[in-house]
């Protein structure tokens, strides 16, 4: 497969995800396919965003690392010290992605590291490992292209997260401001009763304890549900199941007390 064909295969994957979050596991699988390598896509803090490994590489330590979805802190720091592409790293180097304890299997292995950059900052690292064959110039071109594309996707996700947080904050603020004084008081007591982000509420019990009518509680919950801040489900005589949908809601509720 030519370099152009391999590049197009990566582009095709990204076009499938246009407008939605990219699955970095899919990206890792595609990179692995077109470069015939073991692949790790790692965040700047060492979280494994995506990976694709052949069975030969999966020793006990690697399997544990994949289950934790995190590489060791020491290796994360070593990767972050790499400022530009380093290619064809041998197994005796601390930067190798292959387990040194299996030197008999991976004595001829090669690791290549591509820093992932975007928006003027380091976002993570693309690590490729090959059991026997050196990385060619075409491999390096493709790897650097893949790292650039991954960087753009990470930036896009971060931007989307910031936008979503802003929308959530506005929705929470509007919902709280729409509550009357008695409804606001009712909501405070409701979440004190729940003691967390979800739980079972018996409205009459709270109403009797606080000295408000049940209708005030119902109206307050309805306003929050309409704003998308919570979801509720009646369980009949057992009460009402309530779940917070906006993570920052309880923090904001605590702030305005």
UniProtKB/Swiss-Prot annotation:
Family matches, as Gene3D superfamilies: 3.30.450.40, Winged helix-like DNA-binding domain superfamily/Winged helix DNA-binding domain
Residue pairs linked by disulfide bridges in the UniProt entry: none
Pfam families recorded: CodY, HTH_CodY
GO molecular function: DNA binding; DNA-binding transcription factor activity; GTP binding
Compartments, as annotated in UniProt: Cytoplasm
Keyword DNA-binding recorded: yes
Stretches the record annotates as GAF domain: 1-155
DNA-binding region: 203-222
Protein task: DNA-binding global transcriptional regulator which is involved in the adaptive response to starvation and acts by directly or indirectly controlling the expression of numerous genes in response to nutrient availability. During rapid exponential growth, CodY is highly active and represses genes whose products allow adaptation to nutrient depletion.
Matches recorded under NCBIfam families: codY_Gpos, PRK04158.1
HAMAP family: HTH_type_CodY
Family: Belongs to the CodY family.
Protein name, UniProt field: Global transcriptional regulator CodY
Gene that this polypeptide is encoded by: codY
């Amino acid at each position: 497969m030519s370099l152009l064909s391999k590049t197009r295969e990566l582009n095709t994957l990204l076009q499938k995800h246009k407008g939605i979050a990219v699955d970095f596991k899919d990206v890792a699988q595609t990179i692995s396919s077109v470069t015939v390598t073991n692949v790790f896509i790692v965040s700047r803090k060492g979280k494994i965003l995506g990976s694709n490994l052949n069975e030969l590489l999966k020793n006990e330590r690697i399997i544990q690392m994949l289950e934790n979805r995190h590489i060791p802190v020491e290796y994360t720091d070593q990767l972050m010290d790499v400022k530009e592409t380093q290619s064809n790293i041998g197994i005796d180097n601390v930067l190798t992605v292959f387990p040194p304890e299996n030197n008999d299997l991976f004595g001829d292995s090669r690791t290549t590291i591509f820093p992932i950059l975007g928006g003027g900052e380091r976002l993570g690292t693309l690590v490729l490992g090959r059991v026997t064959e050196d990385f060619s110039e075409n491999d390096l071109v493709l790897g650097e292209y893949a790292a650039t594309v991954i960087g753009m996707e990470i930036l896009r996700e971060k931007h989307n997260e910031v936008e979503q947080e802003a929308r959530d904050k506005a929705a929470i603020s509007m919902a709280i401001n729409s509550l009357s004084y008695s409804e606001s008081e009712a909501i405070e007591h409701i979440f004190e009763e729940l003691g967390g982000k979800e739980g079972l509420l018996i409205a009459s019990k709270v109403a009797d304890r606080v000295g408000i009518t049940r209708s005030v509680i119902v109206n307050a919950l309805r306003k929050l549900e309409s704003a998308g801040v919570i979801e509720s489900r009646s369980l009949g005589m057992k009460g009402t199941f309530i779940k917070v949908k906006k993570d920052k809601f309880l923090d904001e509720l605590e702030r305005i007390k």
